[in-house]
Amino acid sequence: MIRAIVTDIEGTTSDIRFVHNVLFPYARERLAAFVTAQQYAEPVKSILDNLRDEIAAPHATIGELVDALFTFMDEDRKSTALKALQGIIWQDGYVNGDFTGQLYPDVLPALEKWKAQGIDLYVYSSGSVAAQKLLFGYSDEGDITHLFSGYFDTRVGAKRDVQSYQNIAAQIGVSPSQILFLSDIHEELDAAEQAGFRTLQLIRGDDDGASHHHQVHQFDEINPEQIPS
């Protein structure tokens, strides 16, 4: 029996183009000026200190830190410091109405149905927890954060590491075999499966021929009571 569902965001609940064509450019355009202006104020000061640790450069100047952040963006590196700064910048965009969090139309009805069935819902994304809450708090469908029991980001571990899913199961307090993980990336599903999770792969485009996970194209194809082994 599935007692908890953990879902990815990018390519799963939300179109990858929203993240890459709207969110990422918005943050990139504002990052240098924002970091420079806020470098001595919290929480940016602490985030930059963490970034210095991340790049092993304890005396890095603000210019060097900005350069590192742009390199991380170019590489699409899952840097916790970068994700935290992006989340802060995106907050202004959401609050100002510059954009709303995009959801596939099949997502909300399924989440509401599963919640009504007594299944706890969680999010696990490489984006910061703050950014996750913003996307669902300012979504196309309004604020749907009440549907989720918790959020996880790279602080729990990388998404392709087995230990990350073991950590999530421990924090949720549910046996891995009773947790369903939804993602569009089969390497993430591989790690979750090795941790004992049940898995389903969301295919929003072409089928993934390299994956052995059961594939669905929409959330309304998912029945938590009938998850293929």
From Swiss-Prot:
Its cofactor is Mg(2+). GO terms for molecular function: 2,3-diketo-5-methylthiopentyl-1-phosphate enolase activity; 2-hydroxy-3-keto-5-methylthiopentenyl-1-phosphate phosphatase activity; acireductone synthase activity; magnesium ion binding. It is an enzyme of class 3 (hydrolase). SUPFAM superfamilies: HAD-like. GO terms for biological process: L-methionine salvage from methylthioadenosine. Its EC number is 3.1.3.77. The keyword Metal-binding applies. Coiled coil: none annotated. The keyword Transit peptide does not apply. Pathway: Amino-acid biosynthesis; L-methionine biosynthesis via salvage pathway; L-methionine from S-methyl-5-thio-alpha-D-ribose 1-phosphate: step 3/6; Amino-acid biosynthesis; L-methionine biosynthesis via salvage pathway; L-methionine from S-methyl-5-thio-alpha-D-ribose 1-phosphate: step 4/6. Binds 1 Mg(2+) ion per subunit. It catalyses: 5-methylsulfanyl-2,3-dioxopentyl phosphate + H2O = 1,2-dihydroxy-5-(methylsulfanyl)pent-1-en-3-one + phosphate. Pfam families: Hydrolase. Keywords: Amino-acid biosynthesis, Hydrolase, Magnesium, Metal-binding, Methionine biosynthesis. Belongs to the HAD-like hydrolase superfamily. MasA/MtnC family. Bifunctional enzyme that catalyzes the enolization of 2,3-diketo-5-methylthiopentyl-1-phosphate (DK-MTP-1-P) into the intermediate 2-hydroxy-3-keto-5-methylthiopentenyl-1-phosphate (HK-MTPenyl-1-P), which is then dephosphorylated to form the acireductone 1,2-dihydroxy-3-keto-5-methylthiopentene (DHK-MTPene). Monomer. This is Enolase-phosphatase E1. It comes from Enterobacter sp. (strain 638). The gene is mtnC.
